[in-house]
Structures are given as C-alpha cells and as structure tokens.
UniProtKB/Swiss-Prot annotation:
Its EC number is 7.1.2.2. F-type ATPases have 2 components, CF(1) - the catalytic core - and CF(0) - the membrane proton channel. CF(1) has five subunits: alpha(3), beta(3), gamma(1), delta(1), epsilon(1). CF(0) has four main subunits: a(1), b(1), b'(1) and c(9-12). It comes from Nostoc sp. (strain PCC 7120 / SAG 25.82 / UTEX 2576). It comes from the Bacteria. Signal peptide: none annotated. This is ATP synthase subunit beta. It is a peripheral membrane protein. ATP binds at G162, G163, A164, G165, V166, G167, K168, T169. GO terms for molecular function: ATP binding; ATP hydrolysis activity; proton-transporting ATP synthase activity, rotational mechanism.
Length: 482
C-alpha cells in the first residue's frame, strides 16, 4: 500500500537491469532513500503496468537506483515514475487478522479490501534502549520439551532447525494456538521465500484448527504475509519487514504479547545477496552482500520486548549444505536466544514433537533465571538421556542383559523420559484423534522429577507416551494393568 505526496514528483526510467531500475528526476527533486515509487500506465506493447519500486541508492546527476517489488516484465525506458513521498506502508491493527497480504500490504486472499484506516511504514527505527524490558522472563508455551529444556524468552528470538517433514509447521501452529488460547495474544506469520504450496497448506490448516475464524475474521488470531519463492528478490527482501511492522503495532499500540514467525530467515539474506551485485556492491565472503550484518541486524533489533509488550520470534533457519559456519546462519546465530533442533531420528520413532533434547539450547536455562529446581531437573533429564545415548552401542552389540544393574535402571528411566517428552497437540487432534494437552511448567517439572527419582519405576513405559501431565501417565498405566 503506498501513499502519494501532495506535490507529485515525476521522473522517467533510464535503465532496467532485471529487478533493478534506474530513474532520472528533475533538478532538486530527488526522492529519499527507501521511498516507494510507482510505475503505472501502458507500455508500447499495450500491457497495463502497475509496479512499485523502492529507492536504494542516489547515483548523482539526478538519478536514483531502485529495486522492484514485483516483476519488471514489460518495462521500457522513458516510462513515467511517480514518487509517493513515503516508504512502503502496510495496514496494521485488528483488520489484518485472518487475512493474507503481499509485501505491499495488499490482500491476496480474494476476500476484498481491508477495511482499516491505519497504515505504518515498513522502515522504522528499533525501540530505544530506555524502552526495552531488561528483566528476562520465560515465555510458557505449554509444550513440555520446550518449557523444560529450551525455555523461550519473552521477547526473545528462537531458531527452529529442521529438515522437511519433521514437524516444524506443526510446532509453529501449536505455538500460535497456545498463545491465542492461554495468553490471549496474536501471531503474525511472514513467509519469506516460501513455496506457494506450503503457504496455501498453512492457511488451510489454520482454518481447520480454528486459529483463523472464517465466519468472523475479527476473531482470528493470526495475520499472514507472504513473499513467495517465485517473486522477485525485492519482495522477498522486504516481506519480513512488512510482517514485523504488523507485529510491532500489536506490541506498541495494543500492548499485547505477539508471536512472529519467519519462515525462512535464510531466504531473507539470500534475496539481499541477489540484488546486492546488481546495486553495484562488491560481494564479500561466499558471495554474500557486504552489508549482511547490517541487513540482519536491522530486522532482528526490531524484534524485542519493550515495557509495553513483547514480540517473541520463532525463525526457521535453513543451513546451506549443513555448514553452520556459512555467513548467513552464522550471522543469524549471533541474534538468537535459543535453538530448537528437530531430530529425524525421534520423528521416525513416532515421538512428537521431535525436539532433540540434547541438541537444543537456550540462554534462559540458568539457575538465576528459571530457578534451581527447574535448572537441576532439566540437567538431570539431559544427563540421563546422554548416558542412554552412550549405552546404546553396547545394548546393540551385547544386549540389555549385559549392563550393570545401575545402567539398566538409567536405560529404563531414560526410555520413560523420552516418551514423556512427547505430547498430543491441539492442532493435530484432527489427525491423531487424541485431545491436545497444555501442560503448565510446574507440572512438567514435577513429572520429570518423579520419573528420575524412581517413584514410577514399576510403571510400563508405554504409559508415558503421548500424555499431558504425569497424573495422566499414572492413570494410563492403571488402565494398561487393569
């Protein structure tokens, strides 16, 4: 969505290089950096054009260089370009809930225009240091494995690492559902360089699970912003900012806790590197843009907690060729408060959510933040699982009977812990048939303490699989015995 300046400033196209367009303006009438320019009209072939470009550089001699937000097919030199006098602005507020937008804030879900008055520019400064919430607080998700082993920071940034089919989307949807029902919060989903099919699937799943209310859109709990894989790099580079702007409004004006999902943060960097060379910048390491750190920082620094509300961000991170030292994931790592790693091994065992309890980390798992009881329980769970992992080779070769009495006990408890880390999800009820469970943090800690203390050694391990709190596991065990 773009606004028009009162005194129209008109230039004309002098050069087109793929998604990059050069425009010449009259003397003393240059647009500012990040201003949106519109190109409308008809070209020589009779094609109707309606295109928005964003100013990136001032070249001198009254010329600017801009990046297009949609395809530049059909553009010719000499076409008129109008300076709107402002950056790209997107609709914000309650009217965005339940809708799908593109990078310009235009609805793309065939449900008509958005009836709201307020828009905000996508380029905004990060909150001032004095406005930030400095006391770290844990954000309860209701998912046992996350709350115990990788607690999320309110207003923090979490990286979600996982391949295809291990359950990234299901975890994202469960988090959206839980923040909506338990915290009364809203979510914004930014699909950056997503497959169109995935975006469509996600939208339909949101409707099925009730997160988007088709009858009354105002009751929905999420706004979706998509810049798909087939779109030019300009759109993929800016769609994250469009989603973030909508989230900032909920935080700053409505004073809410917001969840911001970005899938995939790597493709935001990739889009920047695609246009960087066309803008005449010298590439840096591995061909990435020299401004990589700044680009990532400008996005990440706006995702934070203020004294008014918080934006907690869950970002899917693609790791090129599994190389964690690649500049794109390495730069992202510097901003993350926690990493949730999904394991294909656990998924193949049928343990969902398939979060790797040993590979996932969080800066919040410290005794002075979460308390001694939580910290000690989490570390005891990890050391039990680590010992079980070490013993697996011996078990595979010699069998369980060759282990010492103590090790056999550790294995039995570790298998119960592993199963107790699984949990039925609300958003998966349709597929699993078992009702979803939200488990409070204190119940999670108590449950694992009971398993590790040996109190429940006589219960069968299948009683711990896909249950909520420990009382359900005990009830399930009695049913199995009975």
């Amino acid at each position: 969505m773009v606004t028009t300046a009162e005194k129209t400033n008109i230039g004309y196209i002098t050069q087109i290089i793929g998604p990059v367009v050069d425009v010449k303006f009259p003397n003393g009438k240059l647009p500012q950096i990040y201003n949106a320019l519109t190109i409308k009209g008809t070209n020589e072939a009779g094609q109707q054009l309606n295109l928005t470009v964003e100013v990136q550089q001032l070249l001198g001699d009254n010329q600017i260089r801009a990046v297009a937000m949609s395809s530049t097919d059909g553009l010719v030199r000499g076409l008129e370009v109008v300076d709107t006098g402002a950056p790209i602005s997107v609709p914000v507020g309650k009217a965005t809930l339940g809708r799908i937008f593109n990078v310009l804030g235009e609805p793309v879900d065939n449900r008509g225009p958005v009836n709201n008055q307020e828009t905000l520019p996508i380029h905004r400064p990060a909150p001032k240091l004095t406005e930030l919430e400095t006391k770290p607080s844990v954000f309860e998700t209701g998912i046992k494995v996350v709350d115990l082993l990788t607690p999320y920071r309110r207003g923090g940034k979490i990286g979600l690492f996982g391949g295809a089919g291990v359950g990234k989307t299901v975890i994202m949807m469960e988090l959206i559902n839980n923040i909506a029902t338990q915290h009364g919060g809203v979510s914004v989903f930014a699909g950056v360089g997503e497959r169109t099919r995935e975006g469509n699937d996600l939208y339909n799943e949101m409707i099925e699970s009730g997160v988007i209310n088709n009858e009354n859109l105002n009751e929905s709990k999420i706004a979706l912003v998509y810049g798909q894989m087939n779109e030019p790099p300009g759109a993929r580079m800016r769609v994250g900012l469009s989603g973030l702007t909508m989230a900032e409004y909920f935080r700053d004006v409505n004073k809410q806790d917001v969840l911001l999902f970005i899938d995939n943060i790597f493709r935001f960097v990739q889009a920047g590197s695609e246009v960087s060379a066309l803008l005449g910048r010298m590439p840096s390491a591995v061909g990435y843009q020299p401004t990589l750190g700044t680009d990532v920082g400008q996005l990440q620094e706006r995702i934070t907690s203020t004294t008014e509300g918080s934006i907690t961000s869950i970002q899917a991170v693609y790791v090129p060729a599994d190389d964690l030292t690649d500049p794109a994931p390495a730069t992202t790592f510097a901003h993350l408060d926690g990493t949730t790693v999904l394991s294909r091994g656990l998924a193949s065992k049928g343990i969902y959510p398939a979060v790797d309890p040993l590979g996932s980390t969080s800066t919040m798992l410290q005794p002075n933040i979460v308390g001694d009881e939580h910290y000690n329980t989490a570390r005891a769970v990890q050391s039990t699982l680590q010992r079980y992992k070490e013993l697996q080779d011996i078990i595979a070769i010699l069998g369980l009977d060759e282990l010492s009495e103590e090790d056999r006990l550790i294995v039995a408890r570790a298998r119960k812990v592993e199963r107790f880390l699984s949990q039925p999800f609300f958003v998966a009820e349709v597929f699993t048939g078992s009702p979803g469970k939200y488990v409070k943090l204190e119940d999670t800690i108590k449950g694992f303490q009971k398993i590790l203390s040996g109190e429940l050694d006589d219960l069968p391990e299948q009683a711990f699989y896909l249950v909520g709190d420990i009382n359900e596991a005990i009830a399930k065990a009695e049913k199995i015995k009975g």
